[in-house]
């Protein structure tokens, strides 16, 4: 069978009026063009959807008159029952899970049901697992999301962030990487970088690597915004970046192949990967919220995923209204618990032989971010692993820098004392110094840039950014380290309805946001045309909004959709007043 590129297919659309008329519980729909049937389940603000097609023998479901809770449907062929609230079959129990469809809402509150096609691309050209020799497949944890995989005589590395900060100056490594990390990277046959966030695509790390091996093969997914969109400007001399389509096996040698999958159903930014060696699959979902639209291979040899939470400025950087310290603490506690339970349930459903929580080992270590560090609590990987073991037979691994998992040993006998070799006694596990100076000086250099001697940079920048025709007024305030107004800094309004820069807020009714930004970071971002993730995910802002509404189109534009080339400041300086 020929491999074909994975694409997203819209199965059903509902108008805003149809969405507003959805009743609590079960709703049946038919696509009049295709004749296909679908089920939507509504519980307050939460929606779930699936095909109206029984997994047993393809029968249609109808309302189950015996169901008093309004959650289950019954197949017209053999009376199989599906609980649509959980997407699990309850008669016979423990038989199947129904595949969920992805629900996408547009800005007008219309709805689309979307499915990836093919949904399970890893099933193309299936291979039976072969027995692994001891030492044949070894996984070494380096730090955060970086793993060093020995796969026969090949070496593959995931997401190398080994030095410097991520998100401007907001994230720093929690774990001390092994001292030979650069030698390990240089020996790799290939590197996978999941997405463009700087805790995965670390230009300081790659700069050191490129000085030794500029031609090292690096593989990324074919995302809407290229992963290496900023490579030329970064000054990092990598020459062998390979962009591969989603859902197609990439053959490395006769025993080793990998497949990159998208997050959700639209390949804007995030990806995940399946690595297969001699029929044994390693699934790395990285930071994906809904990897491959929620369809993932079951019973893989090893699964790894994020777990920690806290990768957002919400709610720590917000103030006003409900955003009291008590509210923030309760919200964070509830969100971390939800994430923990979701990850535990996902692992229980997928039943990998081994599970490893990673990609969450960062810390807000700069002294100016003490408040964020204390407020932004993270999930404990051991707590997640305990929860997984309590509810399943999955073997778990909480990694420490330099620890090595021998997959052949662990698959044969999970109790083998040599299956996981911990780092030697006395190995430094946690970082206690981060060399802030050089990285902060790079940011600080932007503060003194000639661009900012001319107030017309504001119009130049936001015209370049290209976001307009949206009823939102934003006040941008440059601040010092402590978020007090920066002496001589800029404080201005942007009206995105007509992209004007008024002296006062307009008289019409309008949503309003105040964004207080550390001057070194906002000016560095503006000068270099960088995405606002450095500001928001990096905790470099303090925000106030009235009303308390998340403006998705605004934030999505500045976090993902800015132009690929920076503003032409050279031309600006030649022509500005």
Curated annotation (Swiss-Prot):
Stored PROSITE patterns: RIESKE
Q: Which CDD domains match?
A: Rieske_CMP_Neu5Ac_hydrolase_N
| Effect of disrupting the coding gene | Mice do not synthesize N-glycolylneuraminic acid (Neu5Gc).
Q: Name one Pfam family in it.
A: Lactamase_B_3
Q: In which pathway does it act?
A: Amino-sugar metabolism; N-acetylneuraminate metabolism
- Mention one GO biological process in which this protein takes part, according to its record: CMP-N-acetylneuraminate metabolic process
Q: Which InterPro entries match?
A: CMP-Neu5Ac_hydroxylase_Rieske, Cnh, RibonucZ/Hydroxyglut_hydro, Rieske_2Fe-2S, Rieske_2Fe-2S_sf
Question: What role is this protein assigned?
Answer: Sialic acids are components of carbohydrate chains of glycoconjugates and are involved in cell-cell recognition and cell-pathogen interactions. Catalyzes the conversion of CMP-N-acetylneuraminic acid (CMP-Neu5Ac) into its hydroxylated derivative CMP-N-glycolylneuraminic acid (CMP-Neu5Gc), a sialic acid abundantly expressed at the surface of many cells.
The entry sums up its family as follows: Belongs to the CMP-Neu5Ac hydroxylase family.
* PANTHER family, sorted: CYTIDINE MONOPHOSPHATE-N-ACETYLNEURAMINIC ACID HYDROXYLASE, INACTIVE CYTIDINE MONOPHOSPHATE-N-ACETYLNEURAMINIC ACID HYDROXYLASE
Q: Identify this protein by name.
A: Cytidine monophosphate-N-acetylneuraminic acid hydroxylase
């Amino acid at each position: 069978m020929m491999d074909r590129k994975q694409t997203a297919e819209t199965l059903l659309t509902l108008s805003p009026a149809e969405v507003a008329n959805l009743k609590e519980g079960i709703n049946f729909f038919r696509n009049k063009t295709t004749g296909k049937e679908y089920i939507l389940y509504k519980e307050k603000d939460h929606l779930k959807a699936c095909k109206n097609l029984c997994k047993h023998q393809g029968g249609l479901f109808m309302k189950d008159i015996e169901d008093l809770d309004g959650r289950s449907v019954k197949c017209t062929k053999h009376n199989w029952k599906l609980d649509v609230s959980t997407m699990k079959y309850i008669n016979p129990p423990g038989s199947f899970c129904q595949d969920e469809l992805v629900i996408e809402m547009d800005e007008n509150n219309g709805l689309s049901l979307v499915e990836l096609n093919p949904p399970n691309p890893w099933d193309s050209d299936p291979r039976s697992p072969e027995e692994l020799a001891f030492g044949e497949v070894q996984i070494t944890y380096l730090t955060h999301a970086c793993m060093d995989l020995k796969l026969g005589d090949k070496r593959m590395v995931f997401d190398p962030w080994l030095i410097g900060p991520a998100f401007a100056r907001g994230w720093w490594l929690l774990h001390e990487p092994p001292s030979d990390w650069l030698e390990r990277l240089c020996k790799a046959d290939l590197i996978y970088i999941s997405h463009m966030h700087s805790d995965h695509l670390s230009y300081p790390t790659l700069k050191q690597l490129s000085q030794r091996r500029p031609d090292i093969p690096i593989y990324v997914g074919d995302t809407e915004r290229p992963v290496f969109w900023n490579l030329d400007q970064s000054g990092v001399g990598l020459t062998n970046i390979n962009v591969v389509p989603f859902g197609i096996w990439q053959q490395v040698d006769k025993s080793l192949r990998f497949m990159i999958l998208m997050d959700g159903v639209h390949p804007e930014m995030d990806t995940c990967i399946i690595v297969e060696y001699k029929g044994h699959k390693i699934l790395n979902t990285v930071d994906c919220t809904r990897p491959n639209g929620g369809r993932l291979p079951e019973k893989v040899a090893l699964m790894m995923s994020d777990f920690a939470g806290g990768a957002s400025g919400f709610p720590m950087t917000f103030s006003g209204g409900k955003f009291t310290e008590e509210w923030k603490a309760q919200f964070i506690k509830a969100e971390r618990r939800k994430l923990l339970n979701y990850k535990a349930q996902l692992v229980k459903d997928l039943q990998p032989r081994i599970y490893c929580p990673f990609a969450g080992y960062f810390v807000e270590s700069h002294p100016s971010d003490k408040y964020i560090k204390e407020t932004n609590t993270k999930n404990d990987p051991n707590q997640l692993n305990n929860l997984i073991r309590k509810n399943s037979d999955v073997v778990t691994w909480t990694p420490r820098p330099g620890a090595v998992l021998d997959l052949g040993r662990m698959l044969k006998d999970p109790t083998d004392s040599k299956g996981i070799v911990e780092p030697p006694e006395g190995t430094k596990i946690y970082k206690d110094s981060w060399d802030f100076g050089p990285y902060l000086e790079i940011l600080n250099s932007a503060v003194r840039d000639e661009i900012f001697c001319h107030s017309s940079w504001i119009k130049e920048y936001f015209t370049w950014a290209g976001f307009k025709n949206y009823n939102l007024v934003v006040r941008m305030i440059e601040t010092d380290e402590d978020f007090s107004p920066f002496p001589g800094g800029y404080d201005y309004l942007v009206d995105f309805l007509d992209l004007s820069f008024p002296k006062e807020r307009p008289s019409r009714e309008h949503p309003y946001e105040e964004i207080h930004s550390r001057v070194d970071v906002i000016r560095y971002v503006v000068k270099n045309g960088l995405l606002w993730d450095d500001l928001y995910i990096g905790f470099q802002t303090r925000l106030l909004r009235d009303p308390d509404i998340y403006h998705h189109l605004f934030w999505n534009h500045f976090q993902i959709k800015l132009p690929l080339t920076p503003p032409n400041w050279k031309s600006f300086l030649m022509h500005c007043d």
